[in-house]
Amino acid sequence: MKKIRIDGNSMNLRDFILVARNGAPVELKDDARTKIKSSRDLVDCFVEEERVVYGITTGFGKFSDVVISCEETVALQRNLIISHACGVGEPLPEEAVRGIMLLRANALSKGLSGIRLSVVETLIEMLNKGVHPIIPEKGSLGASGDLAPLAHMVLVMIGEGEAYFKGARMSGQEAMKIAGIPTVTLVAKEGLALINGTQVMTSIGALAVYDAINLSKTADIAAALTIEALNGITDAMDPRVHQARGHIGQMDSASNILRLLKGSTMTTKQGEKRVQDPYSLRCTPQIHGATKDALVFIKEKVEIEMNAATDNPIIFPEEEDVISGGNFHGQPIALQMDFLGIAIAEIANISERRLERLVNPSLSNGLPAFLTCKGGVNSGFMIVQYSAASLVSENKVLAHPASVDSIPSSANQEDHVSMGTIAARKAMEIFKNSRKVVSMELLAACQAIDLRGKTLMGEGTEIAYQILREEIAQLNEDRIMYLDINKSEEVVKSNKLVDKIETVIGELE
């Protein structure tokens, strides 16, 4: 497997996923080692000189004006970790934890944090050997960074807390011992360097934006299947229409749908059956495309944050300087995560409306009510639409921005916070709900195609139809529907539809 070499400057979303989700090994680049050592040497000088520097020779937050003696610096750093580990709720999933560890190591490898090389190497060794700290999902204000959850990560490094190792939950001390990784004793600046950052919100956000990009392609596939099932009009996808407006995402979505439908005899032209389709079909490129454009923008900002120094204070070895700033503030990611949630929610909104057109006999251009031939005795897809509507409505609540909220903390020293991790967790929940809705549309569209009388389908939609039918048979009479929904979602989750279709018709945008 490809080894990911980090230096604090070159991390991208693809490499992040390889480590967080696929277990790729990580190592420091040589220049990163040099930079880490240089910044640590400067911190040691500050301690020896008893220079007053926030977080090195002072307390934290409201206690920043309390000077700490050289003899107390070790106790200061340990106390910081054990007192700040106040997370609550369920543990974050393994992939998010791995992402957090990777991003924190990457930020430290910039050499601006004043941490010892051996401590960074301990974090990387934990990642490579699969010692995954149990990090509760709740408790971060998003400024100063993700203090509480990151403290839970560091607990394991110092032999405290809990971790998962080889599938078992155990004490941090035991996990480190079994894995053969020595625990660390933190010295001046190191506790602060490890927990003062935005890596929790950024890790969750990176996973969400990566999956959302794939879902946006799957949504185009679902829309194309529904267009076939409803004998939709393809003229609205004409590239001239979308070039006239100029939005790249819109042009890409229309192009995707046309390529997916190429060769289909189930679609129509304007004037053959209708002059124009309803918005949920005709405006799909405009709606999906706006989400695609948002995802491009959000991905760019997330990748910047992946390579950011979000510590405080920041050490500048070349100038022999240290500056207290505010790079830990999560607002740049908080806004993007709220934007991400809204953008993904729109995918579900229009998908549910297309689903409604499939099941509603007044809107489906001749399909049987709720996609069952024996209505009354059978309910068919009636409650599938209910479930989709429920998820869409839940998304509307979740899409309320977290970043507009703030609550003062640390006796008003930290008087504006980002709530970025709440925004990221909400975006991930919206994504999961939206994936389910799109999965329901795919399921219903295949049923509608069967009931319409399947003829020659498009080059891409035929592949999608066959993959789904390999897993889920046509519904001839009522059966337990959640099982079919789950199977459809597993197909979407595996990205099998996108991967297979792209091998035949080329990459979807």
List each language-model region with its residue ranges.
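Glycine-rich, flexible loop motifs
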Residues: 1-14, 18-43, 47-50, 80-136, ...
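Conserved short loop/turn motifs at secondary-structure junctions
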Residues: 32-33, 61-64, 112, 140-141, ...
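FAD-binding core of FAD-dependent oxidoreductases
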Residues: 54-68, 72-76, 84-106, 136-158, ...
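Short gly/ser-rich anion-binding loops that grip negatively charged ligand groups
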Residues: 66, 70, 86-90, 109-113, ...
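Well-ordered mid-protein domain cores that form the structural environment of catalytic cofactors
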Residues: 110-128, 132, 143-147, 168-187
